Amino acid sequence: RSLKNFGENEIFLINVERKFLPFRKKFDYVLKTDNVPKIQRSLLKMPTKTAVIDDAGYILTNRYMREKGQVKNTFETYDNIGNDFWSLFEFIKAELPDDVIVYIIMHEETDDYNNTKLKMMGKVLEQKVCVEGMVSIALRCITDEEGHHFVTNSGGKDISKSPEEMFENLIIDNDLKVVDTAIREYYGI
């Protein structure tokens, strides 16, 4: 739903699970893959300044399911998956121009103590990398009787964070177009 207000030619959508969008719209620039090197090559050639990787968590899951019986050492599988995912984040930061924004959409999970974190696979990403620490902005989607919203900062129980004064409110509409505009205005890009 958060992509709904982008124009058809405003984003490059990387549709990891190759599924239909939850609203009536088709984007002009779509790549259906979960292959990290292919995603990286495509990001270099994309015709827009905004990309969305939805749902990036399935990059991890799909690779694990493909490789789980092929590798004798399960730890090697997790290491390979973790390295691929980490390298995607590093690539985005190092290889793309500063005015290109890549939104990485993922699911979350909540533990027994009500702490919410990104849903990861393997201890490398959960304990060693801290994916949310690799980004400046992490918004969390919540749902209530009024609809879907983004949380812009955390009270310590989840990963929501954004720069000081980027957003006026703690809770904002679940509209990535509005978020994109706010980020570009904040950083002057």
Predicted region positions:
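Conserved P-loop
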Residues: 1-53, 57-58, 62
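A general structural signal for short secondary-structure junctions and capping/turn motifs
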Residues: 2-5, 94-96, 128-132, 142
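Short, well-ordered beta-strand core segments
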Residues: 11, 102, 138-140
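Generic beta-sheet signal
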Residues: 14-16, 105, 141
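Structured loop/turn residues at beta-strand edges in well-structured enzyme cores
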Residues: 46, 98, 133
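P-loop NTPase motor core
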Residues: 55-130
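Conserved GTP-binding G-domain of TRAFAC-class P-loop NTPases and closely related GTPase folds
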Residues: 111-189
